[in-house]
């Protein structure tokens, strides 16, 4: 390394240390300012948020992720008109957002290349590439808009800037032309020949044309760039020769890639990226090549530019787990069953425990009210009062975790082998030939062939007393080390030694060394802000001398696959073991139900194709519901109508409360959604939404996007063309009950379009208590049940006898209604349905206008 390179590295290291050390003084200043807040409730709430921010900063990936977790660093550059922010947003969330982010952003996502999981770091640069950016990236994506000449020329400029800082032959490059802004008003100006020439000028890089509006080639771009990085690393590794550890090349050891059904990863904005947090909508086009983990990736403190936008675009991928805004949670999740609050799952175990904060340099403990539910989620709140009020709560999804007790073998674990530890593998044996994991079923067997009937085995590993590290303290020897419990549910096969590739996740490698008394914190003033647990049971030399002294801690640790740890402590030995056993049972139950939970009611490929064709064959579905474009391939679920791709983009912008958009070709279609679409169709939908168009001209195929958007907003948002309500003395809610009882779909759709949430939830009467959802489920009508749920009916409502709609669905033996109700959080209570009188009318004539209220007979 030459002298200039050494100076550059030294300067970069000093700058990073200065940045890192500047965070805590600012946080401590906030703690001091909090003392001036007179309102105690507000003060505590702000303090909890600051603590959470501090925890997230301290537990960033550089301190928590195992060295065996490989990273791929992708930089994205382009000017404000290039469409790069929409490209990134579509890849992360599956949705389209037109707004461009001037400051760029930092995002994380898991991506799978050749069966190997990688942490993909995406850096959306807010300006031209600088030296720090150029030296950081493993690959670069240059983005321009096909309708903007300036963005096209900017790529040449940015490429020249990159070449000044780094040899571009060292890194893969990808060129992307975006089609998002192309319209009749903005025609395409960059033809294919010019784009191909640019790709040749950029050292013959791969060229893609993408459309973030409907996802064309978006996944393919990122998958391709990831594969190029991996291939480049392998080529470099071969040219260097066999090497166990290469700087900045963490792909030398594999990670246990658990093939679990899709779980959410948090793409967090590191350093003020524009995706600041995520709501609850599910992406419409999920990737089959990427797995998403249900974990929050902590942000770092770098800021791309000093100028921040006042309003950040919010992604549709995530929901905050803090529970600090119950109204938003209720609105966003529609009272799902596993939420915390009224109607949530009943805890199978609960009580007060001590929890250690996530700080690595001190042992600070606080009392938490902890609950464990049978849905595989452990929650903790600062107090019982907060739990009852559903505020300040945090969740731990136990699906990808393990639980361990320092110095004690978990009671459910069985010894399968006695591996020889190594400092590089944190106590895991390199000779694992006695362990076999079948390639398909996920079963784990030991040398003796012991195997659980469920296909999941618990295997413990004893580690030898070699030198190991924990919490930055070095220990040379110890009498016994703790055993890590491994719960294997991935499709991995190995009949030979697995070496470093054996599940090198923190759930295995995180062993616990003897307790040490930490050195005094350099920030002593912080102790007055947070309660610190007594460490009087430790010896002066920092080591607990006997097993009895270790046992007095009554501590257990939950470790996630990504390295997050949660330390809890009970008051007695029995209480701790009870918690550990209950948590292990829920981990096992979550793994066993993992496969079955994703196997919802799905049609086979052939029957699904026939079902989708039946949707296209509905009257009016050969043309777009709003502009008459032929052969529409996009659907609005709650409207029951088909539309063209341009109108679907406008419908997305209306919001899911008005239109739930889904692709016929790209998305999954459960049975209940197919039935909704097969029951309505464009002709029926327009008979409701366009009956009173009053001679206004409907947009045509050649109409501009602006004309189509004006029509669509007037039609669905302002409801200017909506058919009038039927003439009747009944209230809208009572009329909806009658239409549901009669299974009159058109009338029900019309009433739902006119009605409010309160009217949709109107009941048959004080002595009855049934809502329209009860009546729909009693009839086994999944179409009406699904529509009512989308329009805001309370799925947890009970009739006068305490029966939910689920009880009526079970009585009607309607599995489709049962599945829909459970999906939206209806309490799963198997009570015997108490008889409730039928809802009928005294006059069977549907056109009866006597206005008689539905009668209970």
Curated annotation (Swiss-Prot):
List, alphabetically, the SMART domains matched.
ANK, ArfGap, PH, RAB, RAS
**Which residues lie within the region annotated Disordered?**
267-343, 406-449, 496-547
- Domain (Arf-GAP) spans 609-729
Q: Does the keyword Translocase apply?
A: no
What subcellular compartments does it reside in?
Cytoplasm
Q: Which GO terms describe its biological process?
A: protein transport; regulation of modification of postsynaptic structure
Effect annotated for changing residue 854 to T:
In a family with an autistic patient
- Which residue stretches belong to region Small GTPase-like? 66-276
Activity regulation reads: GAP activity stimulated by phosphatidylinositol 3,4,5-trisphosphate (PIP3) and, to a lesser extent, by phosphatidylinositol 4,5-bisphosphate (PIP2). Phosphatidic acid potentiates PIP2 stimulation.
Q: Where are the ANK repeats?
A: 768-797, 801-830
- What post-translational modification does the entry describe? Phosphorylated on tyrosines.
Enumerate composition-biased segments (Polar residues).
422-449
Q: Which GO terms describe its cellular component?
A: postsynaptic endosome
Query: Carries keyword Zinc-finger?
Result: yes
Which residues are recorded with the post-translational modification N-acetylmethionine? Answer: 1
- Mutating residue 652 to K has which effect? Loss of GAP activity. No effect on AP-3-binding
- Start-end of C4-type zinc fingers: 624-647
Specify residue ranges for compositional bias: Basic residues: 524-534
Q: Which family does it belong to?
A: Belongs to the centaurin gamma-like family.
Record's subunit section: Homodimer. Interacts with several subunits of the AP-3 protein complex: AP3M1, AP3S1 and AP3S2. Interacts with GUCY1A3 and GUCY1B3.
Name the record gives this protein: Arf-GAP with GTPase, ANK repeat and PH domain-containing protein 1
């Amino acid at each position: 390394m030459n002298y200039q390179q050494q100076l550059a590295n030294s300067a970069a290291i000093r700058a990073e240390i200065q940045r890192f050390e500047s965070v805590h003084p600012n946080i401590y200043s906030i703690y001091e300012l909090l003392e001036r807040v007179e309102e105690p409730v507000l003060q505590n709430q702000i303090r909890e948020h600051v603590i959470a921010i501090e925890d997230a900063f301290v537990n960033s990936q550089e301190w928590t992720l195992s060295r065996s977790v490989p990273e791929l660093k992708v930089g994205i550059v382009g000017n404000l008109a290039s469409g790069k922010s929409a490209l990134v947003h579509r890849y992360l969330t599956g949705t389209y957002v037109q707004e461009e982010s001037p400051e760029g952003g930092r995002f994380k996502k898991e991506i799978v290349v050749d069966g190997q999981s990688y942490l993909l770091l995406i850096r959306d640069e807010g300006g031209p590439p600088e030296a720090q950016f150029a030296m950081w990236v493993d690959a670069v994506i240059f983005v321009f808009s096909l309708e903007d000449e300036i963005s096209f020329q900017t790529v040449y400029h940015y490429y020249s800037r990159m070449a000044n800082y780094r040899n571009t032959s060292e890194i893969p490059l990808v060129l992307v032309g975006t089609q998002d802004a192309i319209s009749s008003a903005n025609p395409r100006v960059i033809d294919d020949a010019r784009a191909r020439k640019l790709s040749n000028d950029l050292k013959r890089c791969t060229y893609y044309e993408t459309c973030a509006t409907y996802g064309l080639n978006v996944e393919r771009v990122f998958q391709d760039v990831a594969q190029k990085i991996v291939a480049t690393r392998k080529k470099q590794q071969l040219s260097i020769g066999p090497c166990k550890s290469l700087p900045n090349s963490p792909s030398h050891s594999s990670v246990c890639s658990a093939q679990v059904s899709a779980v959410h990863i948090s793409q967090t904005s590191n350093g003020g990226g524009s995706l600041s947090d995520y709501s609850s909508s599910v992406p419409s086009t999920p990737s089959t090549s990427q797995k998403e983990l249900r974990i929050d990736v902590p942000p770092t403190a770098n800021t791309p530019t000093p100028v921040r936008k006042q309003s950040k675009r919010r992604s549709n991928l995530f929901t905050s787990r803090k529970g600090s805004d119950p109204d938003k949670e209720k609105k966003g999740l529609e009272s799902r069953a596993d939420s915390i609050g009224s109607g949530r799952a009943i805890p199978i175990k609960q009580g007060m425990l001590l929890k250690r904060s996530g700080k690595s340099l001190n042992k600070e403990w606080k009392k938490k009210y902890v609950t464990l539910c049978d849905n595989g989620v452990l929650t903790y709140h600062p107090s019982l009062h907060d739990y009852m009020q559903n505020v300040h709560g945090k969740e731990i999804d136990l699906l990808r975790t393990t639980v361990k007790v320092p110095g004690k073998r978990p009671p459910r674990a069985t010894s399968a082998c006695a591996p020889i530890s190594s400092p590089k593998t944190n106590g895991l044996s390199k000779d694992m030939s006695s362990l076999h994991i079948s390639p398909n079923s996920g079963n784990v067997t030991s040398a003796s062939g012991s195997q659980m009937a469920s296909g999941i085995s618990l295997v413990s590993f004893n580690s030898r007393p070699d030198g190991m590290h924990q919490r930055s303290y070095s220990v040379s020897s110890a009498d016994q080390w703790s055993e890590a419990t491994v719960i294997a549910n991935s499709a991995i096969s190995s009949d030979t030694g697995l070496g470093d590739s054996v599940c090198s996740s923190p759930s295995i490698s995180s062993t616990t060394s003897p307790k040490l008394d930490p050195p005094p914190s350099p920030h002593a003033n912080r102790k007055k802000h947070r309660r610190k647990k007594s460490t009087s049971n430790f010896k002066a030399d920092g080591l607990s001398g006997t097993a009895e002294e270790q046992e007095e801690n009554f501590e257990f640790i939950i470790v996630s696959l990504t390295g997050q740890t949660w330390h809890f402590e009970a008051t007695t030995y029995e209480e701790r073991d009870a918690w550990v056993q209950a948590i292990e049972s829920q981990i096992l139950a979550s793994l066993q139900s993992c496969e079955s939970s994703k196997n919802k009611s799905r049609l086979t490929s052939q029957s699904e194709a026939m079902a989708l064709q039946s949707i296209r064959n509905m009257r009016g579905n050969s043309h777009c519901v709003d502009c008459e474009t032929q052969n529409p391939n996009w659907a609005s679920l709650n409207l029951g109508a088909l539309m063209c791709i341009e109108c679907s983009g406008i419908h997305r912008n209306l919001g899911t409360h008005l239109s739930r958009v889904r692709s016929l070709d790209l998305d999954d279609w459960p049975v209940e959604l197919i039935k909704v679409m097969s029951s309505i169709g464009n002709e029926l939908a327009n008979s409701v939404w366009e009956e009173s168009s009053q001679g206004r001209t409907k947009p045509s195929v050649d109409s501009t996007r602006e004309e189509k958007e004006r029509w669509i907003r007037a039609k669905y948002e302002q409801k200017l063309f909506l058919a009038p309500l039927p003439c009747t003395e009944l209230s809208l809610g009572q009329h909806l009950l009658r239409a549901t009882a009669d299974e009159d779909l058109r009338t029900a759709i019309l009433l739902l379009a006119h009605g409010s949430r309160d009217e949709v939830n109107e009941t048959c009467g004080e002595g009855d208590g049934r809502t329209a959802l009860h009546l729909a489920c009693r009839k086994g009508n999944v179409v009406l049940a699904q529509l009512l749920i989308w329009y805001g009916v309370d799925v947890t409502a009970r009739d006068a006898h305490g029966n939910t709609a689920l009880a009526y669905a079970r009585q009607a033996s309607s599995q489709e209604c049962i599945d829909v109700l459970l999906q939206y959080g209806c309490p799963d209570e198997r009570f015997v349905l108490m008889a409730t009188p039928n809802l009928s009318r005294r006059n069977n004539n549907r056109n009866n206008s006597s206005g008689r209220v539905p009668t209970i007979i």
